[in-house]
Amino acid sequence: MAAAWGSSLTAATQRAVTPWPRGRLLTASLGPQARREASSSSPEAGEGQIRLTDSCVQRLLEITEGSEFLRLQVEGGGCSGFQYKFSLDTVINPDDRVFEQGGARVVVDSDSLAFVKGAQVDFSQELIRSSFQVLNNPQAQQGCSCGSSFSIKL
């Protein structure tokens, strides 16, 4: 079943938040700093910004409660060298940037932000999978067909 969901939506480790279809669970972790840390409410992706699509905002409002948000991380791996990792979280760290639009929040750590600044976060729903995805990443040279792996521009 994990292959059907792809690696673009990865479960976190602390507590079950929302059941996904077919028993898939998203899990999460967060602290009281969340509201103070919101640093971007602009829908336009400028220098160092992440833009959220309407479908991303809508899905996040459906699956998050209270101080929960979507965390986007970039890790080494995948077929192209780097891969996107999504999880629900509740803890905002000192090096995190918070991007908020329409009440939905996406948080990116400073190391990962260097690999995704100027990109869009989208939620795609298809017959074979539903997932959050990074689109139009100006830092990516190429990606693979799965949509979760990419190589960077040098």
Swiss-Prot record:
Residue range of the transit peptide in the UniProt record, numbered on this chain: 1-8
Effect of residue 79 to A: Abolishes the formation of the [2Fe-2S] ISCA2-IBA57 complex formation
UniProt-annotated location(s): Mitochondrion
Keyword Transit peptide: yes
Pfam families: Fe-S_biosyn
GO cellular component: mitochondrial [4Fe-4S] assembly complex; mitochondrial matrix; mitochondrion
GO biological process per UniProt: iron-sulfur cluster assembly
Chief location category: mitochondrion
InterPro entries associated with the record: FeS_biogenesis, FeS_cluster_insertion, FeS_cluster_insertion_CS, HesB-like_dom_sf
Keyword check for Nucleotide-binding: no
Molecular function GO labels: 2 iron, 2 sulfur cluster binding; 4 iron, 4 sulfur cluster binding; identical protein binding; iron ion binding
Keywords on record: Disease variant, Iron, Iron-sulfur, Metal-binding, Mitochondrion, Primary mitochondrial disease, Transit peptide
Coiled-coil annotated residue ranges, if any: none
Positions with biased composition (Low complexity): 39-49
UniProt-annotated binding residues for Fe cation: 79, 144, 146
Region ranges (Disordered): 29-49
Cited PANTHER family: IRON-SULFUR CLUSTER ASSEMBLY 2 HOMOLOG, MITOCHONDRIAL
Function: Involved in the maturation of mitochondrial 4Fe-4S proteins functioning late in the iron-sulfur cluster assembly pathway. May be involved in the binding of an intermediate of Fe/S cluster assembly.
Record's disease association: Multiple mitochondrial dysfunctions syndrome 4: A severe disorder of systemic energy metabolism, resulting in weakness, respiratory failure, lack of neurologic development, lactic acidosis, hyperglycinemia and early death.
UniProt similarity note: Belongs to the HesB/IscA family.
Assembly information from the UniProt record: Heterotetramer; forms a dimer of dimers with IBA57. Interacts with [2Fe-2S]-ISCA2 forming the heterodimer [2Fe- 2S]-ISCA2-IBA57 complex; [2Fe-2S] cluster binding is absolutely required to promote the complex formation.
UniProt protein name: Iron-sulfur cluster assembly 2 homolog, mitochondrial
Record lineage: Eukaryota, Metazoa, Chordata, Craniata, Vertebrata
